[in-house]
Amino acid sequence: MISFSSFYKQISDSSLQHWLETLPSILGQWQREHKHGSLPKWEKVLNKLHYPEADIIDFKTSVKIGSGDQLSDGERQKLENLLAIFKPWRKGPYSLHGIEIDTEWRSDWKWERVVPHISPLENRTVLDVGCGSGYHMWRMLGEGAKHVVGIDPSPLFMCQFEAVKRLAGNEQPIHFLPLGIEELPALDAFDTVFSMGVLYHRRSPIDHIFQLRDQLRVGGELVLETLVIDGDENTVLMPTDRYGKMNNVWFLPSVEMLMLWLKKCDFTDIRCVDVDVTSLAEQRSTPWMPNESLVDYLDPNDVSLTVEGYPAPKRATIIATKNQPNKDLI
């Protein structure tokens, strides 16, 4: 069973230490609920990932662990076969001992769009909400973050993250917790909170923004990336059924409305730093994610529309600062 003891130890003398009052029981319950299903099989795969300390580790410019020269061809093929058990790999890419995991998403492109605009992560305690397999967490660590915590309820994403971490070395100050944000208390402790690709999946986007705010210290920075549509501060799209074949998309605001939501939730210094239409080169099927992808979600006769006739995916990144709490909003 995946252990969280090293995380408990790392936060015992940090700004997150009061989380220890509730977190062990919550994760203990999660472990009991996942004794069956695919998780035990995946954990057996993780236990086979015993490899020499990597001669190269780079999280600054990519996520690269090992040059590829340390393993024989047979060892590398064995590692590739083990990593393939965790398909589909959606967020990446990763270079692991010479194995190039070409994921569905070029998450490095998103990171390069975002990182020039955020406050430096050096020595900051960072939370990544809806972190997926953790690609951006490693890049946050590469920017010098003191602690990086990612939360996502998916057991598969957790195992993908753990596979990378075991190859990188378990002593890294980076941890994945299989939780949704609604399971977190109001920690008021993180210097930076990222929520990228989550808001449009939430039935109540305002509640989600409040939950994000509750994790930040006063003066902390929110990095919020989500799907948007064109329009003014009165514009929002709620799909009648599916959007891009997804049945869990609820609200797509305009940039102006999104900024209004943040202002209403008592954030300050609110600014849009990037708007980008998702390209077919950024999200596509690969051997590591052989299922349907963006091209299958768009109108084959007009890629500016989804198959349902809505505007094709466009993503905005908003940065904002947590203000002093307004008692009228609590």
UniProtKB/Swiss-Prot annotation:
Q: Which reaction does it catalyse?
A: carboxy-S-adenosyl-L-methionine + 5-hydroxyuridine(34) in tRNA = 5-carboxymethoxyuridine(34) in tRNA + S-adenosyl-L-homocysteine + H(+)
Please verify whether the record's keywords include tRNA processing: yes
Q: Name one GO molecular function term.
A: transferase activity, transferring alkyl or aryl (other than methyl) groups
State whether keyword Cell inner membrane applies: no
Xref: Pfam families: Methyltransf_9
| The EC number(s) this enzyme carries | 2.5.1.-
What keywords would UniProt list here? Answer: Transferase, tRNA processing
Give binding positions for carboxy-S-adenosyl-L-methionine: K91, W105, K110, G130, D152, P153, S154, I181, E182, M196, Y200, R315
GO BP annotations listed:
tRNA wobble uridine modification
Which NCBIfam families does its entry note? PRK15068.1, tRNA 5-methoxyuridine(34)/uridine 5-oxyacetic acid(34) synthase CmoB
The record's note on quaternary structure and interaction partners says: Homotetramer.
> What is the role of the protein in this entry?
Catalyzes carboxymethyl transfer from carboxy-S-adenosyl-L-methionine (Cx-SAM) to 5-hydroxyuridine (ho5U) to form 5-carboxymethoxyuridine (cmo5U) at position 34 in tRNAs.
Give the family from UniProt: Belongs to the class I-like SAM-binding methyltransferase superfamily. CmoB family.
Q: Protein name, please?
A: tRNA U34 carboxymethyltransferase
Q: What is the lineage of its organism?
A: Bacteria, Pseudomonadati, Pseudomonadota, Gammaproteobacteria, Alteromonadales
